[in-house]
């Protein structure tokens, strides 16, 4: 009985603590600098890139501590990041950033007493690609990164030690023989419990934010990663990426009540976050029901691009790639985009605002999960799953109202499970103004267009609609999945069948397009490569006159109107 009362009390106290939401979706705060130092990473060795990341991280930490007023932008060749830098400098009111190379920067920060010494590590040279599961991985760069944040030391690989010693810096820690498990045991009480970084020891990206925010690092799945995810405060962003089965490591993150940010190739997060706090996120425009001709009883279809919960992609090339949102099509085909509006609006506001300014009225934006997570597994390892689901949904509501997001989408392990339905009911109840929700099955993506209905706070039914078809290369076992031309034929077939058999209603359905699938060798189009937006465009061009391609928001309104034929428009918007 005492245990039960104690559990109830803990849940009550957590509920009170969660109620004061700060609008950051778990992301830490990075204070703003007065000056920016730009350091180019071209032609640097891997060891120098790691060194540079640590210098940037120490500056971010010092600014947070109020002992310094300068931060570092690591310059590299990327159009989108160049635009983010320009916007960030404007937001921070910095007109003339300073330029230094990595060794000038080290000397400068040493003189400013930002660097107290160095942490020694050994580079991982295990055979295999980045973010692969490899034999004999050396984890000392990850251990060193943890100590760099705690001891204010730079990351120094063995090959650079003599050069660093010559500067007069002392060795603060030799991380070469300490395991990640021992590091966690020694350091966890000093670390930030509101996030963690999953990162390949080979990779330098994101070590700046890990050092600035004093985060724990891990890599691979298993008991140790589970230990860290349990330790991290629920409802936190887990940075980076991992190796092995995507469903396995994202599932682990989800079951402990967190979300995967898919941010492993992000750059300069400390500076971008600091600048974003001085920007106002723009609301996006979506069609309202009174802008839609509901008397038109044609067959309607929507195409949706997947993987928008991938932060590193949306920040890195999404807006400028002609294959995706940077397409130059003058007569843009209606296509809707899964995206991470909540995370972008907090972390990279300039990226989000660019998207809003570029958005066409015939498209929709779908918040994809509030981060990569599986609603049916969310917080299953915690004793208060329902409470955490509710608080997560309330966060979504706060951001959805601010950004005018109308559609919540997500991937589930089992779309129609009791646990999934519980999540949908909480989402519908807590997120105001939803037009509807779209659900993807992890495998297969499409579930034949089946749907279910859940009620919002006003007792209005909200649909959760699965994709009828998927455009995904190489999945030959799925009869409702194929290339753009094959799926267009299926859509046309359904519309023709409805007329031929005098069905009561014409089809209202949608297709999920796998963002990375390339159909250049199998589909017919002169506009290459056929992937992303161009896959949608190819399929749209092949639709019969019986089918009208519309945004997902319009499709959801039509589904709701058909489901509630006895009600007028005021019923849906009350």
What do these predicted ranges mean?
Residues 1-7:
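Bacterial N-terminal signal peptides that target proteins for export
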Residues 7-17:
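Bacterial N-terminal signal peptides
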Residues 21-276:
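Preference for solvent-exposed, low-hydrophobicity sequence contexts
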Residues 122, 298-308, 339-340, 366-374, ...:
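Short loop/turn segments at strand-loop or loop-helix junctions that form parts
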Residues 128-150, 247-261, 351-355, 422-427, ...:
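Short, aromatic/basic amphipathic alpha-helical patches
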Residues 222, 226-241, 306-332, 342, ...:
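Catalytic grooves of carbohydrate-active enzymes
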Residues 269-354:
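Active-site beta->alpha N-cap acidic-glycine motif
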Residues 340-405:
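Substrate-binding cleft of extracellular glycoside hydrolase catalytic domains
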């Amino acid at each position: 009985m005492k245990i039960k009362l104690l559990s109830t009390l803990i849940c009550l106290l957590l509920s009170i603590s969660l109620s004061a939401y700060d609008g950051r979706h778990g992301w830490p705060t990075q204070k703003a600098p007065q000056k920016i130092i730009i350091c180019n990473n071209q032609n640097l060795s891997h060891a120098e890139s790691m060194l540079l990341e640590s210098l940037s991280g120490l500056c971010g930490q010092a600014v947070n501590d109020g002992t310094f007023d300068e931060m570092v932008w690591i310059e590299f060749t990327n159009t989108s990041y160049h635009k983010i830098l320009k916007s960030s400098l404007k937001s921070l009111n910095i007109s003339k950033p300073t330029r230094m190379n990595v060794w000038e920067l080290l000397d400068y920060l040493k003189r400013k007493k930002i660097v107290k010494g160095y942490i020694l590590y050994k580079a991982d040279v295990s055979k295999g690609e980045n973010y692969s599961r490899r034999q004999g991985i050396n984890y000392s760069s990850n251990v060193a990164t943890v100590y760099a944040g705690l001891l204010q030391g730079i990351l120094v690989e063995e090959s650079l030690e003599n050069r660093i010693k010559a500067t007069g810096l002392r060795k603060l820690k030799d991380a070469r023989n300490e395991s990640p498990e021992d590091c966690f045991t020694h350091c966890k009480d000093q670390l930030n419990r509101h996030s963690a970084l999953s990162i390949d020891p080979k990779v330098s990206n994101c070590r700046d934010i890990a050092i600035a925010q004093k985060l724990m690092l891990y890599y691979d799945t298993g008991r140790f990663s589970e230990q860290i995810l349990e330790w991290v405060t629920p409802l936190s962003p887990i940075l980076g990426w991992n190796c092995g089965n995507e469903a396995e490591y994202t599932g682990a993150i989800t079951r402990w009540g967190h979300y995967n940010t898919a941010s492993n190739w992000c750059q300069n997060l400390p500076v971008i976050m600091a600048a974003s706090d001085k920007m106002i996120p723009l609301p996006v425009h979506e069609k309202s029901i009174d802008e839609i001709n509901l008397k038109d009883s044609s067959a309607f279809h929507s195409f949706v691009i997947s993987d928008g919960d991938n932060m590193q992609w949306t920040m890195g090339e999404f807006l400028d790639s002609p294959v995706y949102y940077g397409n130059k099509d003058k007569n843009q085909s209606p296509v809707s985009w899964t995206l991470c509006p909540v995370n972008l609006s907090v972390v990279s506001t300039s990226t989000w605002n660019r998207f809003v300014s570029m958005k066409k009225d015939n498209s929709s934006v779908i918040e994809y999960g509030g981060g990569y997570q599986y609603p049916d597994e969310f917080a299953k390892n915690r004793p208060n799953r329902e409470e955490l689901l509710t608080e997560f949904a309330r966060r979504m509501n706060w951001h959805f109202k601010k950004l005018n997001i109308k559609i919540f989408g997500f991937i589930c392990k089992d779309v129609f499970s009791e646990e999934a339905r519980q999540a949908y009911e909480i989402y519908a109840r807590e997120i105001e103004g939803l037009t509807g929700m779209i659900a993807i099955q992890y495998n297969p993506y499409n579930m034949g267009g089946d749907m279910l209905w859940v009620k919002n706070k006003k007792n209005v039914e909200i649909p959760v609609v699965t994709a009828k078809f998927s455009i995904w290369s190489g999945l030959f076992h799925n009869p409702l999945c194929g290339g753009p031309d094959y799926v267009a034929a299926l859509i046309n077939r359904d519309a023709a069948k409805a007329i031929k058999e005098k069905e009561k209603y014409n089809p209202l359905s949608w297709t999920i397009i796998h963002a990375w699938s390339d159909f250049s060798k199998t589909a017919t189009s002169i506009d290459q490569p056929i992937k992303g937006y161009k896959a949608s465009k190819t399929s749209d061009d092949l639709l019969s006159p019986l089918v009208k391609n519309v945004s997902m928001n319009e499709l959801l309104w039509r589904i709701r109107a058909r489901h509630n034929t006895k009600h007028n428009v005021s019923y849906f918007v009350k």
